[in-house]
A protein has these predicted regions:
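Conserved P-loop NTPase "ATPase switch" module shared by AAA+ and STAND
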Residues: 115-132
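N-terminal pre-Walker A segment at the start of P-loop NTPase domains
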Residues: 15-46
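Pre-Walker A (Motif I) flank of P-loop NTPase domains
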Residues: 48-57, 120
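Walker A (P-loop) phosphate-binding loop of P-loop NTPases
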Residues: 62
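Conserved lysine of the Walker
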Residues: 65
Length: 227
């Protein structure tokens, strides 16, 4: 997947500002794709013990994390599902209710096998855990999901260690946190401004230090004053 080139073209067509931190994230997503889906790449490395089936992106509101993960998702050509986490858990509980009489196999295993049959990638946008019922089963559920080698994208405002913080019986939730940390590449997107509430840099007199971020701001400033 030549994600970076496609992303640059996408930003150019949409007249979107390109931030170096966002470009770095695109590179990490491209690596995630190559490690998990690029067969020619996999043949070259044969086996990479650093390969992980999950990608957890944390960042504040408005930094563009959803835009970038959505772009990755739209360019992903295999079977996939984008779903809100609460909706996903409702689908699990509905499945559990409908299949409660089936004692031949564990309900979680049945549910995950169904996922495996339909999807190679699942994308949870704005992931968070607030429900104690969900919190208590996530460890077993995602252990099965990752064991089936289903790839998972997470977008969240919350870092992994702070998920379900101060929640009831949180000690029983901690195995899920360990699973996420073991099975996911962890990235944090840091942007100084909220693109949905961006303010002009016209009042700035100088930019420092001289790095890629500063270069981005100077280019943005130039575009603003030459409109």
């Amino acid at each position: 997947m030549k994600l970076k080139k496609s992303f640059l073209n996408h930003c150019k067509k949409k007249n979107l500002e390109i931030n170096p931190n966002q470009l770095e994230l695109v590179d990490h997503l491209n690596k995630f794709y190559n490690l998990n889906f690029n067969k020619s790449f996999l043949k070259k490395i044969f086996y990479n013990k650093n390969t992980k089936p999950g990608f957890y992106l944390q960042g504040a509101v408005g930094v563009g994390k959803t835009m970038i993960l959505n772009f990755f998702y739209e360019n992903f050509k295999f079977s996939k599902q984008r779903i809100h986490f609460n909706e996903f858990m409702i689908s699990f509980h509905n499945f559990k209710f409908k299949n409660k009489k089936n004692k031949k196999e564990n309900i979680i295993e049945q549910f995950v096998k169904k996922l495996k049959k339909n999807y190679e990638l699942i994308y949870f946008d704005e992931f968070q855990v607030t429900n104690i019922v969900d919190a208590m089963i996530l460890g077993n559920l995602f252990k099965k999901i990752f064991n089936e080698n289903i790839k998972v994208l997470f977008s969240s405002n919350i870092k992994i260690n702070d998920l379900y913080k101060d929640g009831l019986q949180r000690d029983q939730f901690l195995p899920f946190i360990k699973i996420l940390k073991d099975k996911c590449f962890q990235e944090k997107l840091i942007i100084e401004e909220d693109y949905r509430k961006s303010q002009s840099d016209k009042n700035k007199r100088f930019f420092y230090p001289l790095d890629s971020t500063t270069n981005f701001k100077v280019n943005k400033f130039y575009r603003q004053i030459t409109k």
